[in-house]
A protein has these predicted regions:
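Short hydrophobic beta-strand element within catalytic cores of glycosyltransferases
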Residues: 213, 222-225
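Short alpha-helical donor nucleotide-sugar binding micro-motif in glycosyltransferases
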Residues: 183, 192-197
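Conserved acidic donor-binding segment of nucleotide-sugar-dependent glycosyltransferases
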Residues: 237-238, 242-249, 258-263
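Nucleotide-activated donor-binding/catalytic signature segment of Leloir-type glycosyltransferases, i.e.
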Residues: 163-184
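A short, active-site helix/loop in glycosyltransferases that binds the activated sugar's phosphate group
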Residues: 57-89, 98-100
Length: 278
C-alpha cells in the first residue's frame, strides 16, 4: 500500500511510479485540506503547467482512495469530477480525529465549564504569514481584558519580534495578561492549557485541517476562528463558536470583548458527545 499526504506534483509522480512497478498495489492519498490549484484550471497555462495538469489527471485515475477532511472540499471535488475517473467510488470524507488513547494515558482530569479559567489561548507557529498572529495582537490592542488572560503557544518567528516589542510598548499593562509561552512539546502540558481555557482563537489566513481546532473542540473550548473550511465544519453552524472575517481584527476584538463582558454565552457543550471527533 502506498499512502501519501497532500496531492502535490511529487505525490502524483510517486503514485504513477508505484502503479508502474506494482499495478495491483493500493494507492491512497490524504489531502489534509490541500489540493494543487492546477486540478481546477488548465486555461492560459504555460506548457510546463499544462503537462503537470495532465499528470494530475492521469494520477487521479490511478488513485484507489482519496480522503478529504472538509465538507467544502469534498463537495467541490465531487461536483467537479463526478462524471470522471469513478471519483464517487474513491472519494471519502474523513475529518481528522482526536487521539483518545493518548489522552487516557496522561491522567488529565477534564474540567467542566464551571471549573475552567478565564483564559483564551491560541497555538501554532506564531508570526508566520499563514497564522496571521498580527491580527490577534491588533485585536488585543483594542480589548480590555479585565480578569482574563491570553496565552499564545508556539514558536515565534523573527518577523514577530519587532511587532511584539511594539505591542508591549503600547500596552505595558498587558504584560500581566498576555503571555507568550513558547512551543510546548509535551502533550500533557499542552492539553492542560486547552483543559484550563474557555476560549480558543485561530486567526489563520489558510489551513488544511488544523489539529489545534480538533483539540480545542475536544476540550470544550469556545472557538473563535477566521473563516476556514475546517472551522465551518467543526463549529457546526455556529453552535460551538464564531467565524470572523479574514483580516478583520476589529470584528475579532469586538466579539472577544463581548465574551469578556459576559454578553455572549460560551458554555455551549452541554450535549456534546466527544465521540464525534474521536
Amino acid at each position: 500500500i502506498l499512502l501519501r499526504i497532500h496531492f502535490t506534483f511529487m505525490t502524483a509522480l510517486f503514485v504513477l511510479l508505484y502503479k508502474m512497478i506494482n499495478p495491483k498495489g493500493i494507492t491512497a492519498v490524504k489531502l489534509d485540506g490541500y489540493l494543487d490549484p492546477l486540478f481546477f484550471s488548465s486555461d492560459s497555462l504555460s506548457l510546463f503547467k499544462r503537462l503537470k495538469h495532465k499528470v494530475f489527471f492521469r494520477t487521479l485515475r490511478q488513485v484507489d482512495l482519496l480522503t478529504v477532511e472538509t465538507q467544502c472540499l469534498y463537495d467541490r471535488l465531487y461536483k467537479e469530477f463526478i462524471d470522471v475517473y469513478d471519483i464517487k467510488l474513491k472519494l471519502v470524507l474523513m475529518p481528522n480525529g482526536f487521539d483518545e488513547e493518548t489522552l487516557k494515558t496522561l491522567s488529565i482530569v477534564e474540567k467542566d465549564f464551571g471549573h475552567k479559567e478565564n483564559i483564551m489561548i491560541t497555538a501554532g507557529r506564531l508570526g508566520t504569514y499563514q497564522k496571521n498572529t498580527e491580527m490577534l495582537l491588533n485585536a488585543l490592542d483594542l480589548m480590555e481584558l479585565r480578569d482574563w488572560k491570553v496565552y499564545l503557544i508556539g514558536s515565534i518567528s523573527e518577523d514577530l519580534d519587532f511587532f511584539l516589542k511594539d505591542f508591549f510598548m503600547r500596552n505595558p499593562s498587558k504584560k500581566e495578561s498576555v503571555f507568550f509561552v513558547g512551543p510546548i512539546y509535551d502533550k500533557k502540558s499542552l492539553w492542560e492549557f486547552y483543559n484550563r481555557a474557555k476560549v480558543f482563537i485561530l486567526t489563520s489566513r489558510f489551513e488544511g485541517y488544523p489539529l489545534v481546532l480538533t483539540e480545542a473542540k475536544r476540550f470544550r473550548n469556545y472557538i473563535v476562528s477566521t473563516e476556514l473550511d475546517a472551522s465551518e465544519d467543526l463549529l457546526e453552524n455556529g453552535k460551538y463558536g464564531c467565524l470572523i472575517a479574514q483580516e478583520n481584527y476589529k470584528e475579532l476584538a469586538l466579539f472577544c470583548q463581548k465574551i469578556i463582558n459576559g454578553e455572549i454565552c460560551i458554555d455551549v457543550y452541554e450535549n456534546y458527545d466527544k465521540e464525534d471527533i474521536s
